[in-house]
Amino acid sequence: MEITEIKLKKRDKIGKQYAKKYRRSNLIPGVVYGAHLKENIHVLVEKKDLWNLIKKGHSKEQHILRLIIEDGENTITENAILQDIQIDPIKDDLLHVDFHAVSLEEVVDVYVPVVLVGESKGVKQGGILQHGVEEILIRALPLDVPPHIEVDITDLEIGDSITVGDLNLPENIKVLTPADEVIVNIIPPKGYTEEASTEESQTESQS
């Protein structure tokens, strides 16, 4: 997992009225929390810096951030995961951000997005792809957490499926999502019969 550095400022004023003032100054209020912290750290993030993280995929994939937090004349450094971003659905404006501070020596439980790759044989035959589980809960050291998990669907035919238990992940990653959860399956189209599919496959192989 790559590490990206971002600068923050510690804030003392908390509440909706102050949050609005901060946002008008292009500063997004946020909080840093974690099991090893004595107390939550309330912070401010430059709006442009937060948008840059989103554009780089940090809101959809897992990456370690190195938070450089200015606290007057002091500087606090924490490693963290971008846990949540609140965005106004109407104005598409940033409202708040949560950072989950982590120790690089302690395992964390995080959700990692699933990315389907390839084009299924079953879809080419007219089957319909159904995407089930879109995130997998795993336990690993922060630097061992992958940004996403790729699932190759190329060989899936109509009626086939891939479950969480079918994933082949490194030994240093423990999967916490139930093994029988379906990630993807190819369902038959309306009026589908195995005989028709077999005849179609034979025709394609002869052409």
Curated annotation (Swiss-Prot):
Keyword Signal assigned: no
Q: Where are the transmembrane segments?
A: none
Question: What's any GO biological process attached to this entry?
Answer: translation
Give the Gene Ontology MF terms in alphabetical order: 5S rRNA binding; structural constituent of ribosome
Supply the PANTHER family for this chain: RIBOSOMAL PROTEIN L25/GLN-TRNA SYNTHETASE, ANTI-CODON-BINDING DOMAIN-CONTAINING PROTEIN, RIBOSOMAL PROTEIN L25_GLN-TRNA SYNTHETASE, ANTI-CODON-BINDING DOMAIN-CONTAINING PROTEIN
Similarity comment:
Belongs to the bacterial ribosomal protein bL25 family. CTC subfamily.
Q: What is this protein called?
A: Large ribosomal subunit protein bL25
Q: Which organism is it from?
A: Dictyoglomus thermophilum (strain ATCC 35947 / DSM 3960 / H-6-12)
Q: Which gene encodes it?
A: rplY
